From Swiss-Prot:
It is found in: Cell membrane. ATP binds at residues 170-177. This is ATP synthase subunit beta. F-type ATPases have 2 components, CF(1) - the catalytic core - and CF(0) - the membrane proton channel. CF(1) has five subunits: alpha(3), beta(3), gamma(1), delta(1), epsilon(1). CF(0) has three main subunits: a(1), b(2) and c(9-12). The alpha and beta chains form an alternating ring which encloses part of the gamma chain. CF(1) is attached to CF(0) by a central stalk formed by the gamma and epsilon chains, while a peripheral stalk is formed by the delta and b chains. It is an enzyme of class 7 (translocase). It comes from Mycobacterium leprae (strain TN). One of its GO terms (cellular component) is plasma membrane. Belongs to the ATPase alpha/beta chains family.
Length: 485
């Protein structure tokens, strides 16, 4: 019996400085041929020098696929205008890296780590790769702790987890970005923490407004900003969240700080991944999204976590396409969240800000074992009253409020006061309302809503509860309307 001897062919992966040449350009997708046996590894950054409109520029390409025959398919992180076949491409030998350290605070960077407000700044800093492994199971923090925000509706009904992942869901124009700006202000002013903001595929104007506003309220010095706005190629929009997360990881792991990571908007991360997937020729999955949607989302979300004594708390704005929560993009995000704050168009239409829907929002730590028995009891009573009010809406619309029982009439009046008391004057809206933002301690919030649910404020006019802070504000406004608490 004869035996056939098989031999393995070893392929030497690319090393730093190896040069190839462009053989195909299709929008942001660039195919590059390398010498035999010197193929760059996946996620390696390649540099291509080109000229467009008499200006020389260097493009950064990221290896996405090995096609065989010494060809790699890459995604460009800059516009490929002027790039032609035959252009020399150099393998850097490393993946994309960004500057880290205390020096990144107070500055704006792009996905590649280049400083936008001060060109050349940060080049000498230590750089970390944006592709990193999440902390091991042994490093994770087992303790669960509440993050106090000073916003009544959040602290009472959807308490945030320190080191958790929090999402702001909502359609277009209901206040997701404003609420994120509010949280940056509150964390910097009240807690002195470090914030990292990732602008993923949103409007350039919003980024500029945020930059100016953070300067005005003197919190820019504690915030690092990383932008990849909606006019950028999909490769940039897909990587900018990882760049910001890498900066946040340095503050957690090396500086032992609690960090807040803001991502606006996580849907654009998914959208960019879908565009890249299509460009790479992958078969689309449900509703046209990429087949690797859950994997890509998991790679990002698993790195956002608490290690022992240190945390990254993430707030992510999630655009909901056509207000459809069954869309795969928001649905995939749900699986990773500790708290959800849903911003509702119907609440927004009532002029209640922040426009949080208290019945649709939720938190995994609204549990008596974590927030305490009293907090849990008051929150459940508020939810019960608001749910009953919602159930009565059809009867009120058809027959009128006079047809309700005396008990239900009392409950409706109480629910309307609760709805208005859940609104609050915000720091981010001071220039529009002329009112300074207010911060309400959790204990005061619980006490105020407990008394409200028991009917102690039934005699106070509804408008006294609108856009105010705590009990002191309520007392002043009630007295101005001729009522006493």
């Amino acid at each position: 019996m004869s035996t056939t001897k098989t031999t393995k062919m070893t392929v030497k992966t690319g090393s730093k400085g190896t040069s190839g040449r462009v053989v195909r350009v299709t929008g942001p997708v660039v195919d590059v041929e390398f010498p035999h046996g010197f193929v760059p590894e996946l996620f390696n950054a390649l540099n291509a020098k080109t000229t467009f409109s008499s200006l020389a520029k260097t493009l950064t390409l990221e290896v996405a696929q090995h096609l065989g025959d010494n060809l790699v398919r890459t995604i460009s992180l800059q516009p490929t205008d002027g790039l032609v076949r035959g252009v020399e491409v150099t393998d850097t030998g490393n993946s994309i890296s960004v500057p880290v350290g205390e020096g990144v605070k107070g500055h704006v960077f792009n996905a590649l780590g280049y400083c936008l407000d001060e060109p050349g700044y940060g080049d000498e800093f230590e750089h970390w790769s944006i592709h990193r492994k999440p902390p091991s199971f042994e490093e994770l923090e087992p303790r669960t702790e509440m993050l106090e925000t000073g916003l009544k509706v959040v602290d009472l009904l959807t308490p945030y987890v320190r080191g958790g992942k929090i999402a702001l869901f909502g359609g277009a124009g209901v206040g997701k970005t404003v609420l994120i700006q509010e949280m940056i202000n509150r964390i910097a002013r009240n807690f002195g923490g470090t914030s990292v903001f990732a602008g993923v595929g949103e409007r350039t104007r919003e980024g500029n407004d945020l930059w100016v506003e953070l300067q005005e309220v003197n919190v820019l010095k504690d915030t690092a900003l990383v932008f990849g706005q909606m006019d950028e190629p999909p490769g940039t929009r897909m990587r900018v969240a990882l760049s910001a997360l890498t900066m946040a990881e340095w503050f957690r792991d090396e500086a032992s700080q609690d960090v807040l990571l803001f991502i606006d908007n996580i849907f654009r991360f998914t959208q960019a991944g879908s565009e890249v997937s299509t460009l790479l020729g992958r078969m689309p999955s449900a509703v046209g999204y990429q087949p690797t949607l859950a994997d890509e989302m998991g790679e990002l979300q698993e790195r956002i976590t608490s290690t022992r004594g240190r945390s990254i708390t993430s707030m992510q704005a999630v655009y909901v396409p056509a207000d459809d929560y069954t869309d795969p993009a928001p649905a995939t995000t749900f699986a990773h969240l500790d708290a959800t704050t849903e911003l509702s168009r119907s609440v927004f239409a009532k002029g209640i800000f922040p426009a949080v829907d208290p019945l649709a929002s939720s938190s995994t730590i609204l549990d008596p074992g974590i927030v305490g028995e009293e907090h849990y009891r008051v929150a459940q009573e508020v939810i019960r009253i608001l749910q009953r009010y919602k159930d009565l809406q059809d009867i009120i619309a058809i027959l009128g409020i006079d047809e309700l029982s005396e008990e239900d009439k009392q409950l409706v009046n109480r629910a309307r006061r609760i709805e208005r008391f859940l609104s609050q004057n915000m720091m981010a809206a001071e220039q529009f309302t002329g009112q300074p933002g207010s911060t309400v301690p959790v204990k005061e919030t619980i006490d105020a809503f407990d008394r409200l649910c028991k009917g102690e404020f039934d005699h106070v006019p509804e408008q006294a509860f609108f856009l105010i802070g705590g009990l002191d504000d309520l007392t002043k406004k009630a007295e101005s309307l001729g009522a006493k608490l």
